[in-house]
Amino acid sequence: MTETLTGRLSRRQIACLLAHDIADGNCVNLGIGMPELVANYIPDGREIIFHSENGILGMGPEPGPNDIDYDLINAGKKPVTMLPGGAFFHHADSFAMIRGGHIDICVLGAFQISATGDLANWSTGGPESVPAVGGAMDLAVGA
């Protein structure tokens, strides 16, 4: 990591610190927002398999400006890259992986986290929207 760790950490510094804590060989679900940055900072020589609940296994770092493919997106509808050997599958199979305990770590984005670990990471959107937590509850239990 080339950034200096002084004062408040940036989103990229947090992602870098987290990436260095992930053990070699782990299967990791990356949530939406700041968690997406983690794939950019995996140490050389460490193999981590990244998962997205929309049915992707084997994501790589974020794409450069000339590498964006809008047909290749994560659960947050953001462009991603794939590593050799990556796979696509139905989201029901993706949730079977999560619920079956086949994901080692989940990196969730959060709006708030209490001192006791309670997580608030969803929004109702507009006043007419139906509230939904997405895959967070499955991931919090299954990973």
Question: Could you describe each region identified by the protein language model?
Answer:
Residues M1-P84:
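N-terminal active-site beta-alpha-beta segment that forms phosphate/nucleotide-binding
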Residues T2-Q13, E62-A143:
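Conserved phosphate- and dinucleotide-binding cores of soluble alpha/beta proteins
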